Amino acid sequence: MRFTVGIALCLLLGLGGFVYFFIVDGRVPQSTDFNPSIADIRRLANAPAEERPSAIEVEFLAEDQLPFFGLQAGLDFRSATMARSAFRLKSNWGNTLIDVGMDRYVAALFKTGKKFDDTSLARIGSAMVTARRIVVTHEHPDHLGYLPRSKSLDTLIPKLRLTREQIEATAQYMEDGRIPEAFRGVDPVSSKGFTSVAPGVVLIPAPGHTPGSVLFFVQMADGREVLFVGDIVWTMSNIRDETGRSRLVQSVLMQTSEDRPKTYQVLRWLISFMDQNPDVLVVPSHDDSYLRELVASGRLVQGFGQLQP
């Protein structure tokens, strides 16, 4: 009897350890080696006010429903909405797109975007044609997938500022599995330092979620500052609770495994950055309720084309 009880206890302890390690543990380290100089970034973002962005638009292209523990480590089984979004910075200099989403082919290929808005996709397509600059936060399908499949790709090439990792990833979104020929002549943006990609807009390399992950720091025309963080966090509670994604999500459920140590290093920096810079607006890509709060408060405008060009 004692032997049976002992075996049962060992199994329970083993199961508990497994659940904790793979699902519950999302502790963020207390220190980080990721320390981009915000002073240098601000200097690089400095540009004439009339050329910097004056407004930010957001498209809600698609969405998925999943339990909250898919967004943040833990055992929260509440249903959460994961938005698939794209952003446009409106400027007299010319508009800048941050992420371009995916079409239905890519969404089906990667089994994402269950609720899909074709009208939103059409607006994103038109915005790519009229934009002066196009950038992406990283190379995952819901951020980059539509770009290489655009029928206007040849005319979009001069507008692009992509890293080498982002360019190489375009192959997986094509039926033939090859990088489109139009990309062959593209000179990639450096993944080693900060790059001004448009007046008031600075690219900050932040590998971890993917090798080509970047942040975008924006100085608006009125002096406001915005930080687009892509998928460093999937919900703002990752920052508030200092809790990242679980190992199960990072290693098993994502299309490609996430570099947990690097991602958590960037997350620790982001937590500290927000604490030291509370007036900077942080914009993640997937937190549906938070993004809609920003729309309701007027800090984002929903829908490309809702403002005059």
Language-model-derived ranges and their functions:
Residues M1-L15:
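N-terminal Sec-pathway targeting helices
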Residues D64-R133:
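Pre-active-site segment of Zn-dependent metallo-hydrolases
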Residues G145-T155, E293-G298:
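Metal-dependent catalytic neighborhoods of phosphoester/phosphodiester hydrolases
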Residues G26, L121-A122, R224-E225, V229-P309:
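Cap/insert and terminal regions of metallo-dependent hydrolase folds
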Residues V100-D103, E139, H209-T210, G230-I232, ...:
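Active-site metal-binding loops of divalent metal-dependent hydrolases
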